[in-house]
Every structure is written in C-alpha cells, then in structure tokens.
C-alpha cells in the first residue's frame, strides 16, 4: 500500500549575501552587494495505488526534494572601490549631479551623485555583468530597485541596505521559477507565492519563514493534486487537507513531517452514471499512523455498511462493530480484516429484521424469518419496526411483505425523488454523490403538501426523531420515513385493517407525492444561487432557532412574529400582514384569507425560509455601480460592456440575472446588517439585564442580611449594660 503523499526536503539553508560598505572621500565610492538565492521546488513524483472494497490504499507520494534551486548565486563583495575616472557634474571637488564613475576592477556606476556619494537613482554594473538599477542612498542600494544577473535572472522590488527586504519578485531563468511576495533580510519571509514551472501548474501560495514554506499555505502540484493547510520546514505539518485529483481521494486532518499522522478523515470519491445513486462515499474517520489506518476508527462504505472499531496497519483488527447494508449487526473480534467468527445470520439476506438495535422490542423483529431475500435488495431493508409493533404478531410478516411490494412498484420514482432533492443547492460535486439531508427532506414534504393533513412539519419530525436538519439520510431511511408518515396521516381513513401499512403508503403516494414531487417551492431551494447564498447563514440561523426552542416549549408562528417585533424589524416594507401572507404561501393553515392561526409550530426549514421571505420584503434594491462616484471613462467602459452583454443575452435572461443579483444583495443586507446584528444586540441586552437584575438581587440580599445582623447586634447590646455593671461591681 502506498504511503500518503510524503514531501521530502533538504534542510539546506539558503545563504544570503554579505554586504560591505565603504564611505567615499571625494574620489572613492562604495556599494553594498548581495548574493541572490534561486528558489526551486522538486518534481511531482507519483506511484501507483490500489483501491479495493475492504482495504483502500492511500494515495502515492508527491516527493518534493529541494536542492539545486536554493543554492545561492554569489555576487562579489566590494571592500574598497576606487574611482579611476569620473565623467559628469561636480560641485567644487565633489561629485554632484548626474555622472558616470569608472571604478577600479571594471565596475561602473551611472546615475545621481550628491556631495561625492551615490545618492538617488542610478545603475551599478559589476565587472562580472551583475547589474543593479534603482534607488541609492548614501552609497547604499536603498528603496526600490532591480537586480539583473548575466543569465537573465532578475529581482525587482524593495531593497534595504542592498538586501532584498520588503515586497519584491524574483525570476530565475535557469529553473523557470518565480517568487512574488515578502522578503526579510534577503530571505523569503511572510506572505508570498512561488511558481515552480513556466506553465504555472505547480505553485505555492502562503506563508514563508527563513526561505521555507512554514505556516498556512496552499500547494498545487503539476499533477493537479492540491494541499492546503499548515507547513513546517517545507513539509506538510499540522492541520491540512490534501486532494488527489487523479485518484479521486481526499485526506483532511493531522500531518507530521509530510505524512498523515493523528486524527483525520480520508474520503474515496466514487463516480457514477447519471441514473445511479450511491448512498454515500467510502470514508474513514479516525486514527492514522504513518499514513495507515491504525488505532480507533470508523469506516463508512458507499453501499451503506458501517464498521466502527479497532484498526491495525490498514486492516480491521481487534474489537469492532459492523453494520451490514441490510441493517444486520455483527459485534465482536476482527482479525486481519476478517471477522474472527462468522455471524449467526446470513449477512446478505433481509427479512423482517430490526435494522437498528436501539429500536424497541428488537428481539421480536430479529426472530422473524430471514431466509427470504427482500424484493427491494439487501441494501434497502425498511426500518418500520415501530409500526409493525402495532400489528398483531401473526400478521406482521404479511404486512411487511405487502409494504415492500408497494414500495417496489414506486421504486423508480422514489430513487428519482431522492436524487433530485439531494442535489438541491449543489451546483457540482467531484463524485456526483449528494446524500439527502433532513433540510432537503423537509422541502420534499412541504412540496408534497404532507403538512396539510392536520399535522405540522415539526410534529412529523418528532415522529421520526430528527435532531439536526443537516444530518444525512440514506435511501432506505428516506423510504422508511415516508411509510411512517403515511401511516400517521392516513390510517384513520383506511377502512380495512389488513395490509394497512401498504394501503397508507399507496394513498400518500397517489394523492400527494406523485402529483407534487419535484415541483420545488419556497425561498431556499428554488434556485441554486439562492441556496448557495442563503446557506452561508444556515448555521447561525440554526443556533438562533435552537435558542428560541429552548426559551419556548413550542416555537410557533406567533413567537416568530413577536421575535421580529422585539428586534424592531417592522417598517413600511416589512409589516405583520405582509409577513402572514408570505408564510401562508407554503402553509395555508396559517391564513386562509379571513382567519389566521398563529399557534402552528414551526420547523427549522419554515423558520429559515421565513427569514428569507423577510429579506425579500425588507430589502432595498442595491445598485451595482454608483454613477455619481464613477469617472466618465469608467462609465463609458461599463456602458460598452453592458451593450456587448445585451447583444449576447436575451432580454429575459438579462432580467432574470438582474433579479437574481438583486435577491442576493437583499439577502446579504438583511442578514449581515439587519437581522443578525439586531439579534446579537438583543442577546447582549438580555444578558446585561440579567446581570444587573442578579446584582440588584445580590445587593438586596446583602442589605437584608446586614439589617438582620444589625438588629441582632442591637438586641445583644440591650443586655450588655447589665453584664458590664456586674463585672464592675465584682472588681
């Protein structure tokens, strides 16, 4: 098995020029000189890698030897330069003004002089051909200048005391490398980018320390592979992500000396045909040692199977838990990637089983027959044990089979629906795999008007135990959820008690899903750009929604309306009546034109899309260009571009693009400048109010305690004179 993309580098230091400075006396001049480094990087070497279902190898090495490029180019050090001949302006006996000085040894300076010193702009040429053009200050290259070597290599940028210091660009003709960025005392240090070939397919952009890649940076290799993360001494070290484009693999996690070591996640992407759908990608998350899976880790297989346990040198070894595609579970000892004991059941078959061991009454489900293969396939075992428990034990197997047959009749459509909704909000994917999330599943339920059967979306989610809208759903889980929802909605309308699960599922498919699926509504997923922009605020909105749910046992439309009032967001554009009409588009039960019901519970998707609706109502149109602040030439250029674009684009597309840009600006303005700042201010005010109230309570308590103590002391003082008199009389 190949190790993961190691990067070797020499520890050779990059010597920088020594400088010599000699002050001139009327007829002598001195100059700082330096030797300039020619930076390079190594070749992008690759070796073969083997990938299999059980043991997937890590990607090849990308060795990066650093050698000849970082050797210095020595420039003569000028210890004492005597002017043999001078041609130019003078002031008295001093060189002053423009002139040409010919130095002993064949060196020449042409440029500005001031009181006998090279000062101002000039050109200095060494006898070996090295040339400096730029600023001089008191005989020293200082400011901005250009070094040019005899072979054509150049440095252009800031110079301090004759050394590259500041921002500059170095081009090496021999190695075709280019560095552009910050320098410190002649060495690459700070932010900079290095291109290692003429095609600019091999480069590094990031932080440098002492001529080495160190800190945070991004490295693109000639093969197209990319690493972005932390570096130390020219090798990957710390947290980082490496993507092997040629192998469709990615590792994200910890690195030590160029090798995957510590905690990390390795993903194997899978290409698929347009009509196929894998549940997920092969992905390992856990411990790595020397680029191998070693220690504790979890492997998610693309088929839906899952292994969680111990690993040793890339193989399952030790105690582990394996969940098969059909939901069966084996827990025990593994040895060299194999189960130490064959499980008591047939892993590839599925009958009336309990796919998840944490379901209630799993022993009953496990006792059912598993000798017959499921018509849906071994990877599509339904998890509806909670519904089967409502059926008499004698009829459970028949009920389960009839549900499977009902699902089988619609399997093609169900797969299309899963693929369609899982791709909402995604423009592209490296592996074309989009696991469905609960947020997308919520959109599917709203599109199919499932919530219009006397049950809210939030109540539906309580039935299937949803804890996060961003959790992925496997196809078998998605179908199981639909069956559970169908039963709770339709079972009262089914007269016969026989095959009731299949009847409820078929009714929901016929009345709701088939006519309405894939007709996307709402503010979030109606356009890919809408989702791309809005999802930037989903995490923060989820935090706010959770906080509101904690504050209220049930978060309803009424609480949402009052929240906007507390945040002082209502104005002429955003009013309560407009808000209610917007919310009732997806949920007609909120407002039927005459009556309003504000006590309906809101799910997170409804909450998030309600915020997006508020952004549309409240947002003002933002112009892309402010013509009052744009000069005439730029206006003419913009006008010509607009005319050219209009010629290529139809009026309908131009209008749609304008509307889309307007929506993006309004959404960003609402969240960044209105809603989120107002909510954060409200939280701070509440915290400060609570703190002040707590301080007031504390002070009041202290005052009561002090008063009580004073009263006790006063009661004690009334007895003190008697005691004193007694003592005095004794004396």
UniProtKB/Swiss-Prot annotation:
Alphabetical list of InterPro entries matching this protein: MORN
Polar residues bias locations: 7-17, 722-731
Ranges for the MORN repeats: 86-108, 109-131, 132-154, 155-177, 179-201, 204-226, 227-249, 251-273, 284-306, 307-329
Any Pfam family matching the protein: MORN
Subcellular location: Cytoplasm, Cytoskeleton, Cilium axoneme; Cell projection, Cilium; Cell projection, Cilium, Flagellum
Superkingdom classification of source: Eukaryota
Protein name as it appears in the record: Radial spoke head 10 homolog B
Origin species: Danio rerio
